[in-house]
Amino acid sequence: HAGAVADLAEQLSLPIEGPHRDDEFWIEGMPEAGRRYGFPPLRSFTPDRWLSDGDTVTIGTMTLDVLHCPGHTPGHVVFYHAPSKAAFVGDVLFEGSIGRTDFPRGNHDDLIRSIRSKLFPLGDDITFVPGHGPLSTFGRERQSNPYVSDRVAR
């Protein structure tokens, strides 16, 4: 998901914010991953700012809270906008599913813990935007998601 970051930042003269430093190994490995999977050449990069839990990121007039939610990757971050009750969760949570944890340094237990301890406490009425697929709410997933619903043993 970050293969063009270095080129875009250079072309548009934009700073790179994030990810969390725990994903540095992914960034450093991008050139090799690109070759392995037949992508055009990918460049690694060094962010202008690594993101940590509790940071904020401002885009235009919107300020987003940063939540470090490891599991899918160790440095995965979620962006939360309290005024609009929206969370941009990437590949942590999906409608009826959760993110993969079979990547290097992914961890299923960390992912479940991130969802239950960082995301669900934000409120059942929070709409989330996943990295793929339809929108949902934390409340809906607490009710019916077979991986993290309240009915699943902890």
Predicted regions and their residues:
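Active-site HxH/HxHxD metal-binding segment of metal-dependent hydrolases
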Residues: H1-T58, Q143-R151
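Metallo-beta-lactamase
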Residues: W26, E32-R35, T56, M62-H68, ...
